[in-house]
Amino acid sequence: MKISESWLRTWVNPAIDSTTLADQLTMLGLEVDELAPVAKPFTGVVVGEVLTVEQHPDADRLRVTTVNIGNGEPLQIVCGAPNLRVGMKAPVATIGAVLPGEFKIKKGKLRGIESQGMLCGASEIDLEDKIDGLLELPEDAPVGLNIREYLKLDDNIIDISITPNRGDCFSIRGIARDLAVLNQLEVTPPDIQAVEATLNEQKQVHLETEGAPRYLGRIIKNVNVKATTPEWMAQALAASGIRTHSILVDVTNYVLMELGQPMHAFDLAKLNGAIHVRQASAQEKLTLLNDQNVELNEDIMVIADDAKVLAIAGIMGGLESSVTDDTQDIFLESAFFAPLAIAGRARRFGLHTDSSQRFERGVDFELPLLAMNRASQLIQQFAGGEFGPITVAENTALLPKREAIELNQQQVSQLLGYEVETDFIADALTRLGCQVAVKAQGEWVVVAPSHRFDITIYQDLIEEVARIHGYDNIQIRLPKIDVKLAKYQDHLELGQLRQTIATLGYQEAISFSFADLKLEKQLNPDVNPLALANPISSDLAVMRSTLLSSLIPCVQHNLNRQQNRVRFFELGLRFDYQNAASIHDLQQTPTLALIAVGSSVPEQWHGKTQPMDFFDLKHDIEQILAAGRVKVEYVRSERAWLHPGQSAEILIAGQSIGYLGRLHPSLENDLDLGVTWVAELDQQAILQSYVSNFTELSRFPSVRRDIALLISDKINVSDIQQLIKQTGGDLLDSTWLFDVYTGQGVEEGKRSLAFALLWQHPSRTLEDAEIKSGMDNIIEVLENTYQATLRAS
């Protein structure tokens, strides 16, 4: 929005220069995009009066004039302007004048006739040309007065970018209000007096829609629509980028820019009956002031009479009821339209008007009467007329409510991060137009003014305090962090985990936490997943209880595209339904999931690839857990969706942290998959295992002893290893299986298992007797527990 600096200073005039004024507006949140002079610098141009006009003897298009500039003898000037005439007043560039573009005026001759200056058009003094020819000045323009002074060309135009929340600042009044508060000055508005009614004639107004809580109208008769717009008004409008049209249009535009209230004048003779503010009917048509034909529908609010639509409310008037040069009587409108009733309607018709721009953001609902009085005052002053009483139609229940907001000193300090004086807070809010009541020391109850639609919560009030106190006054201090920061080590370990899995040939998948109900039931029939109220698709309708319900579709997608080796992992969240008595008990568990199909290694030239098996997957799991140097155990898994003979639970310190294995063949068949290997582990357990626990390495020699056992093939190897570890005690450092044999020499139903046992003491060398005693105890326990026997060498 563009405004004249001099116009703004008639409302509030702080003792600061133009640049500082622009900086203050920007710091108030009214960002100044440009501060530019009304006209470029020039000198030596004054108001002149044409005394005589004679034809040039040697040029048909030139004439010789004498011009009075109020200083000595009249000047002889040769001019070719078509509108040149005796008695007119126009700008005169005298000898020595320098016009924009460094154009210097010198004494010269045109076709043999001496010319002592130049009569100027608008463009020659950096103004917009309205006509072809000289810039005609009013008859009362003082001869000899510097044209820059007379036309106020030493003024500046301030171009301000108004944010959507500050609809109240689309006017001189709104900007002056904030500027006055910042500089602790009083606003000096024009003296607006109500124009008394001189005739008793009114239009009935019916409010038939909730979008128009307040509507004012006034009949004005015998208006001189051909009256000349005063120069000061034309200059103010020109500075705002608004062309002058006629006195009525110029007055309503002036009130729009001055007070921020859109207004409209209808030709009274073209209105039939009462005024109705209503919603349009489907397919109602209207020709707008810009000659655009539009078709309306039920969500468009209109102004109508008893017979037809007159205007789109808050956007643009209709051509049929518009004021023309033949208009004598008018009906003047000033209203409050609800922002939501106007928002988006103008753009629907490809329009963007000053009126819609303001109503969309919110116009002060207490402003229509003041604006009506101001417009009436200006019309009476410059166009005359007889005025009827002001008709007020309103539904106060539909006017915006001004709710009380509680504010205290602590809230201000906490949000801003520094102390603002109590008196300043109350004073600033009061000067901004808020109603401020003291509740207690440092506590207030505040009601926002009618023009501020953006103040609804206490944070909005604190923002106002900060604006007026000055953003540049915010103290420089180090931030105070009250929140608990995430441990960097956790992020480091998570990144390390991702990198470890990626080096094993898996690609990371990132999927939704939503899953297909059917797949969830196939994986775990006992689970009743939480259904989404508004799923994005039918196959993403529940919250997943396992990451496999997200990874399996990824595998299917890739297999269907000729990818015969697929390996994915995901670090994500799953819902734990097991211990949830209600929805409120549900918890999400960070989980690592693996899925693999195809060969154990990519196809290679130097060797035959083998299908992936249980031990390949177990190797990957052990690589993932190896960084933690924790002791991992495996026991048979009883999960229904896993292969009963090729799956296991993963234990650390006796607690299950997940599982690994092959999907059950029947499930593979249902899902149209080949042999598919999967694993799921508790992510937190993995990261906790990464915590380093250092123990001093023994400097004393270790001793290895091997035993080969004949034992039933029904007994799990993990159970045997667990028993060996428990029996061996602290001196047994580790044990592992290194040979399995069945066949000749081993009776049916049994197998030979060979274990290595590593013995070591942390602070001394073990004696043979100690090792022998330990070995004997282990063999005895195995014999008694599993009927194991030593295999003969």
Swiss-Prot record:
Reactions accelerated catalytically: tRNA(Phe) + L-phenylalanine + ATP = L-phenylalanyl-tRNA(Phe) + AMP + diphosphate + H(+)
Record GO cellular component, one term: phenylalanine-tRNA ligase complex
Location of the FDX-ACB domain: 698-791
Signal peptide segment: none
Alphabetized SUPFAM superfamilies for the sequence: Anticodon-binding domain of PheRS, Class II aaRS and biotin synthetases, Nucleic acid-binding proteins, PheT/TilS domain, Putative DNA-binding domain
Cofactor: Mg(2+)
Disulfide-linked positions: none
UniProt-listed InterPro entries: aa-tRNA-synth_II/BPL/LPL, B3/B4_tRNA-bd, DNA-bd_dom_put_sf, Fdx_antiC-bd, Fdx_antiC-bd_sf, NA-bd_OB-fold, Phe-tRNA-ligase_IIc_bsu, Phe-tRNA-ligase_IIc_bsu_bact
Protein name per UniProt: Phenylalanine--tRNA ligase beta subunit
Gene: pheT
